[in-house]
Design a protein with these regions (language model features):
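Active-site-proximal catalytic alpha-helix in oxidoreductases
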Residues: 126-134, 155, 159-191, 203-214, ...
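Interdomain hinge/lid region at the active-site interface
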Residues: 160, 208-274
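Rossmann-fold NAD(P) dinucleotide-binding segment
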Residues: 50-111
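NAD(P)+-binding Rossmann beta1-loop-alpha1 motif at the extreme N-terminus of oxidoreductases
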Residues: 1-62, 85, 121
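Rossmann-fold dinucleotide-binding core
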Residues: 92-175
C-alpha cells in the first residue's frame, strides 16, 4: 500500500518505520526536516508538504500534537488528495474536533478516521499499540493493513469521533492509575516502608495493574525519561474535562488528576514522563 505519514516525533517515527518493515511504500513529512532523516535512511520517500505526502497515495496518516496541528495538516492533505484517499489521524484530540475535521474532509471527498493509540513509545517501537478507530466500515477496512503493522489490539469503536472518546477514556484510566501508584509509593515512603517491597506485595493481589508493574518499576528506578511527556497527558486530561463540561458530566476523579498534571507542568515537570507525578507528590509532602 502507498502511505503518506505526517509527524515523526516520539511516536510517529517508530510507527512509520514499522510501516516500512511491513513492505508498504511510505512517504514522510515533518515540520523539522531533520526528523525525516531516519525514515529516508530506512527507505521512505520525502515529501515537501502535507499535500505532497497525500499525492498519489491510498492512505495518509498523521501523528501530531494537537487539534490545530491536525486541522492544518489535513487541509494540506485535502489539497493533494486523489479520489478514494483515506486520511487517518492517530493523534489524541477532542472528539468534537475529530468530528469537525472529518466533516471538512468529507466535503473535500476524503474519507476520514480518528484512530488514536495507547501503548507509548515502547508499544510504537514494538508494533504492539492499541488502536481505537472511529469512522466508516469502508475506511476501517482500507486502513486495517496499515494498523496491523503498528498495533496488536485494533478495535473499530464506532463512527467518527468514537476513537477519540475511547482514547479519552483510556487517559482517564491511565492518568488515575499513574497517580494512584505514585500516591501509594509516597504513602509507603512517608511511613518508612520500602516502596519496592510494597510494590511486590501489591503485584500479587487485586491491586495488580500493568501501570503498577511497568511504571511502578520505573518510579523505583527514578527513570523519568519521557515515553509520554507530562504536558501531553495534561493536554489529554484537559480534553476530558472540556468534553465533560460540554456534556454536563461529573468526573471528580478526572478533575483531581487533571489538576495534578496541570501542577506538574506549572512546576517545570512538563517535559518529563507522566510518572514524574511522583516527584510532585514528594515535593508536596516534604520527601524531595
Amino acid at each position: 500500500m502507498k502511505i503518506g505519514f505526517i509527524g515523526l516525533g516520539i511516536m510517529g517515527r517508530p510507527m512509520a518505520l514499522n510501516l516500512l518493515k511491513g513492505d508498504h511504500e511510505v512517504t514522510v513529512w515533518a515540520r523539522r526536516a531533520e526528523s525525516m532523516h531516519p525514515l529516508l535512511d530506512a527507505g521512505a520517500k520525502g515529501a515537501g508538504s502535507p499535500a505532497d505526502a497525500a499525492q498519489g497515495n491510498e492512505l495518509v496518516i498523521s501523528m501530531v500534537a494537537d487539534a490545530p496541528d491536525v486541522a492544518e495538516v489535513m487541509r494540506g492533505v485535502a489539497q493533494g488528495a486523489v479520489p478514494g484517499l483515506v486520511a487517518v489521524d492517530m493523534s489524541t484530540i477532542a472528539p468534537a474536533a475529530a468530528r469537525r475535521i472529518g466533516a471538512e474532509l468529507a466535503a473535500a471527498g476524503v474519507d476520514f478516521m480518528d484512530a488514536p493509540v495507547s501503548g507509548g513509545e515502547v508499544g510504537a517501537i514494538a508494533g504492539t499499540l492499541s488502536i481505537m478507530a472511529g469512522g466508516s466500515d469502508a475506511a476501517f477496512a482500507r486502513a486495517k493493513p496499515a494498523f496491523e503493522c503498528m498495533g496488536k489490539n485494533i478495535v473499530h469503536v464506532g463512527a467518527s469521533g468514537a476513537g477519540q472518546v475511547a482514547k479519552a477514556a483510556n487517559q482517564i484510566v491511565t492518568g488515575m492509575g499513574v497517580l494512584a501508584v505514585a500516591e501509594a509509593f509516597a504513602f509507603a515512603a512517608k511511613n518508612g516502608v520500602d516502596r519496592g517491597k510494597v510494590r511486590e506485595a501489591l503485584l500479587g493481589g487485586f491491586a495488580y495493574s500493568k501501570i503498577l508493574e511497568n511504571h511502578g518499576q520505573r518510579m523505583l528506578d527514578r527513570n523519568f525519561k519521557p515515553g509520554f511527556k507530562s504536558w501531553m497527558h495534561e493536554k489529554d486530561l484537559n480534553i476530558v474535562m472540556q468534553t465533560a463540561h460540554e456534556l454536563g458530566l461529573c468526573l471528580p476523579g478526572s478533575a483531581a488528576t487533571a489538576q495534578m498534571f496541570n501542577a506538574m507542568v506549572g512546576s517545570g515537570l512538563g517535559e518529563e514522563d507522566s510518572i514524574a507525578v511522583l516527584k510532585l507528590l514528594e515535593r508536596l509532602s516534604g520527601q524531595a
